[in-house]
């Protein structure tokens, strides 16, 4: 039926044309895993097929397997999940969805747990910015970029694909989804995605207090969420393209509290809604020139509610609304075969309306201008850019609450990176980079209740790195081996932190951090027999992140939630009968506070998962059945202190491609 609708849409526009017909071949393509060994900056990628074979449950699970990343996970299926790269902080990491950045000016960090993995075609993490010279100025301004690209199959004219999936698992998890792709014309594709997920999240854990222990169940960890999006992708005859996306997300969840002294009773609730409409137009406007124009409108709404006798009416309620109007234009110029240049200009207007008493309802206008150049001559590639940031704010209720308007902020942020191929006939590269970035204070940093401080300066970060990459040639059954190793040094100054004053906490610029580390990755593919192959990937990070604040009582201590050693491993065995995926992630010991004492120490852990899947051909349709066991050893651990993570869980899924 889906194909018939798609054919009708195509035929209606061309019903006067009579042509002969030859047999056509349907080609479905998925963006394959990239080694990225030739990039001047570290880039790690996971294809959608890798993600599905491993049975990963969410974006955070995938990101944990990338070197240099630190995911804060507050536990449970609905717990908030944020990512920091090389310990610069979640506010320095940009998240893009099909090429355009996702924003949250109020809090400054993105909950990556809200994004579905089911329609991901490629997930990549870049240190610095992405590799596309035509990207937005926001990408160039970020210290790291997590890019989510949705799946786009290649179809014949008038053809369509329908994917129905049902997933269920432990703790009441139920997750149906539907995806539809339609090649409505020779140059136009439409797609629809919808999914629903719910879970009660009442997973068991062992509560320990000294020598005593008891078996408990997690409370207030339920979630119910809906997600839908529609895309229209069109290619023009002049080589241009126009991609338009409408996206909607709604969730209601419990906010699981910390488990302290046998008390994990939490009655906090959170409702989230997010809608955005984005469009991107790209084309070559002359032989040497190309243009990319992007625009986006975002509306975010969230409601926080806490029921507790300590409040005057027994309940506390906060409602926040954010609106963003965003536009971006990038003009690229390639005067010679070895030189490319680009000029990117972004303008964003962000507005916050909140019921929190004392908020001045701020409006921020930000301009980002990036001048970019990339030269490739012989075996050397050099990339450089400089970003100019200008931000100004106005306050609707400044006089009412006697809040001073922050000063306008201006900043130049340069970046330089290069790579050099050491041998002309061997894929062996060395690379180095330096990058300066900064983050503006969030609306919460500036205005939230009494802790906000409108005198805050931007937080500055400087990145330095050097490394080596190698990709082998095929050797017998060994398709390839890809290795990367990068050493880095980062320093962060004017850190924005909450600092105790005489009566209350206050946001201030106080502190300096120095981060030293080494990231290493490995990937290989081996054909072990006809129809049998192994794909293996691993990552390892060693990191020292020290407090270097002069006069601080914790000077020289490892920063909170920063393990010195962390890593991940995944192995896929592909056979004609069943595909087996194994993955493991782990972290060494770390501390929940700046005081590196046993009282605040979190023990290291390793989590192992196993997935079995098989594809069945049913006529012209494909059915995939998959069974995944997460945390096979039922290891109990915490990523955030007093927030226990789930133990062993089982997920079963069926996916039908029509």
Where are the language model's segments positioned?
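Short, acidic, small-residue-rich periplasmic hinge/interaction motif at the N-terminus
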Residues: 12-52, 60, 125
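Extracytoplasmic beta-strand/coil segments of soluble accessory domains associated
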Residues: 60, 64-101
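A beta-strand signature from Gram-negative outer-membrane beta-barrel systems
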Residues: 117-163
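Transmembrane beta-barrel wall of Gram-negative outer-membrane proteins
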Residues: 168-198, 209-252, 273-290, 336-339, ...
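Flexible loop and strand-edge segments within Gram-negative outer membrane beta-barrel domains
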Residues: 201-205, 215-225, 233-291, 297-324, ...
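Membrane-embedded beta-barrel scaffold of Gram-negative outer-membrane proteins
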Residues: 288-306, 429-433, 459-516, 521-523, ...
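Structural signature of Gram-negative outer-membrane beta-barrels, strongest in the C-terminal barrel
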Residues: 336-346, 350, 354-490, 570
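Gram-negative outer-membrane beta-barrel transporters
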Residues: 482-491, 509-592, 633
């Amino acid at each position: 039926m889906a194909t018939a609708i798609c054919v009708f849409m195509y035929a209606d526009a061309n019903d006067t044309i009579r042509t002969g017909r030859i047999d056509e071949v349907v080609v479905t393509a998925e963006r394959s895993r990239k080694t990225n060994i030739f990039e001047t900056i570290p880039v790690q990628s996971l294809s959608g097929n890798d993600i599905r074979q491993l049975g990963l449950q969410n974006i955070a699970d995938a990101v944990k397997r990338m070197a240099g990343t630190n995911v804060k996970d507050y536990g449970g299926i609905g717990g908030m999940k944020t990512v920091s790269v090389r310990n610069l902080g979640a506010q320095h990491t940009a998240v893009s969805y099909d090429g355009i950045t996702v924003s949250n000016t109020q809090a400054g960090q993105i909950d990556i747990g809200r994004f579905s993995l089911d329609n991901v075609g490629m997930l990549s993490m870049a240190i610095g910015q992405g590799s596309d010279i035509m990207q937005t100025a926001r990408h160039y301004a970020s210290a790291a970029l997590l890019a989510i690209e949705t799946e786009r199959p290649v179809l014949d004219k008038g053809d369509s694909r329908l994917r129905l999936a049902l997933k269920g698992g432990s703790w009441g998890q139920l997750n149906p989804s539907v995806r539809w792709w339609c090649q409505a014309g020779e140059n136009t594709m439409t797609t629809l995605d919808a999914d629903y997920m719910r879970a009660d999240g009442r997973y068991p854990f062992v509560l320990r207090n000294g020598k005593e222990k008891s078996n408990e169940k997690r409370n207030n960890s339920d979630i119910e969420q809906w997600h839908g999006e529609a895309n229209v992708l069109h290619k023009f005859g002049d080589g241009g393209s126009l991609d338009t996306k409408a996206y909607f997300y709604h969730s209601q969840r419990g906010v699981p509290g910390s488990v302290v002294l046998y008390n994990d009773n939490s009655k906090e609730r959170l409702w989230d809604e997010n809608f955005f409409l984005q469009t991107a137009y790209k084309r070559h406007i002359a032989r040497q020139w190309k243009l990319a124009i992007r625009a986006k409108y975002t509306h975010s709404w969230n409601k926080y509610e806490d029921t507790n006798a300590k409040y005057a009416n027994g309940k506390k309620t906060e409602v926040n609304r954010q609106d963003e109007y965003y536009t971006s234009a990038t003009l690229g110029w390639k005067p010679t075969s070895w030189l490319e240049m680009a000029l990117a200009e972004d303008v964003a207007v962000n507005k916050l309306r909140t019921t929190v008493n004392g908020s001045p309802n701020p409006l921020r206008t930000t301009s980002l201008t990036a001048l970019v150049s990339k030269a490739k001559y012989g075996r050397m590639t050099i990339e450089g850019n400089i970003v100019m940031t200008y931000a100004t704010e106005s306050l609707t209720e400044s006089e009412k609450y006697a809040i001073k308007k922050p000063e306008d902020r201006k900043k130049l942020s340069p970046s330089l990176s290069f790579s050099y191929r050491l041998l002309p006939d061997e894929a062996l590269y060395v690379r180095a980079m330096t990058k300066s970035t900064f983050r503006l204070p969030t609306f919460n940093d500036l205005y939230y209740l009494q802790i906000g401080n409108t005198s805050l300066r931007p937080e500055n970060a400087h990145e330095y790195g050097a490394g080596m990459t190698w990709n082998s040639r095929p050797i017998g059954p060994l398709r390839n081996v890809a290795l990367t190793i990068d050493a880095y040094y980062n320093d962060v100054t004017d850190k924005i932190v909450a600092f105790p004053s005489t009566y209350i906490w206050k946001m201030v610029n106080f502190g300096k951090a120095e981060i030293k580390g080494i990231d290493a990755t490995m990937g290989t593919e081996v054909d072990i027999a006809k129809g049998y192959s192994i794909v293996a990937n691993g990552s390892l990070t060693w990191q020292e992140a020290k407090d270097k604040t002069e006069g601080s009582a914790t000077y020289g201590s490892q920063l909170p939630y920063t393990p010195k050693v962390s890593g991940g491993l995944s192995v896929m065995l592909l056979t004609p009968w069943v595909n087996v995926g194994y993955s493991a992630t782990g972290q060494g010991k770390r501390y929940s506070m700046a005081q590196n004492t046993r009282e605040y120490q979190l023990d290291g852990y390793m989590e192992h998962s196993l997935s079995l899947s098989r594809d069945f051909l049913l006529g012209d349709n494909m059915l995939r059945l998959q069974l995944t066991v997460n945390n096979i050893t039922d290891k109990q651990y915490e990523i955030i202190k007093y927030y226990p993570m789930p133990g062993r869980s089982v997920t079963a899924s069926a996916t039908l491609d029509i």
